[in-house]
Each structure stands twice: as structure tokens, then as C-alpha cells.
Amino acid sequence: MKTHRPARVGELIKREVSDMLLRGQIKDPRVGAGLVSVTDVEVTGDLRQAKIFVSIFGTPEAQKLTMMALAEVTGFVRQEIGHRIRLRYTPEIAFVQDRSLERGARITRLIDEIRAEEEARAAHKEEGN
């Protein structure tokens, strides 16, 4: 029987970590180097581990600093999750950088470039007739 509990717990963790980031409860100044948002949380079936996917808007250097800071505050974040969500075991957490938005923007840019090239070719072809 498949349970939906990991997904529900993931949504709770996502909400709480987002709240911590929004309210500035994570005191490390490097976390503020880039604009951070929680995009997804994957929790294992036994609820013992959670991957927190974050999207970071900023320079590559700011993204790197932010990921280093998040790696260092995992203990604090886990402790806060334990206080905020009633679970038998608080999951071990790991922050993972979500690059799907960057990939999506890159694909959109490539499509726009191809479309512009095709329009230029079509215009050049019409001039030739």
C-alpha cells in the first residue's frame, strides 16, 4: 500500500524552511548573499531523510557561498523542524541546489535565438524573390 505521508511531510518541511528563510531566522549572512527559495522537498518513505531543493538567484559566487552556508546550518534547521513539526524522528536534511529554473531560462533563450534566426532567413528569402 502506497502512503502519501512522505509527500505531506515534505510539504510541511518546505513551508517551515521557507518561513525560516523569509523571517531571517537563519542568521548566517552568507545565506542572504543570494535570493533563496525552497522549490521542493523529497522525503524518503521511512521519513528519516529529506532533500531540500533550493533555487538561488544571484552570481555564481553568491550561489556557492549560499550553498556553503546552508550546508553549515543543517543542524539548526533540523532542530527547528523538530520543534515545529511533530514527528517521531526528525529527518536528516541535505540542501541541494535546484538548477531547473536556470535550465528553463537557458532553453527559452535558445528557442528565442532559433526563432529569430528562422525569421531572419524567411525575411532574407522573401527579399530574394
UniProtKB/Swiss-Prot annotation:
It is found in: Cytoplasm. GO terms for cellular component: cytosol. Keywords: Cytoplasm, Ribosome biogenesis. One of its GO terms (molecular function) is ribosomal small subunit binding. It comes from the Bacteria. PROSITE patterns: RBFA. GO terms for biological process: maturation of SSU-rRNA; ribosome biogenesis. Gene3D superfamilies: 3.30.300.20. Pfam families: RBFA (PF02033). The keyword Cytoplasm applies. InterPro entries: KH_dom-like_a/b (IPR015946), RbfA (IPR000238), RbfA_dom_sf (IPR023799), Ribosome-bd_factorA_CS (IPR020053). Belongs to the RbfA family. Monomer. Binds 30S ribosomal subunits, but not 50S ribosomal subunits or 70S ribosomes. One of several proteins that assist in the late maturation steps of the functional core of the 30S ribosomal subunit. Associates with free 30S ribosomal subunits (but not with 30S subunits that are part of 70S ribosomes or polysomes). Required for efficient processing of 16S rRNA. May interact with the 5'-terminal helix region of 16S rRNA. This is Ribosome-binding factor A. The gene is rbfA.
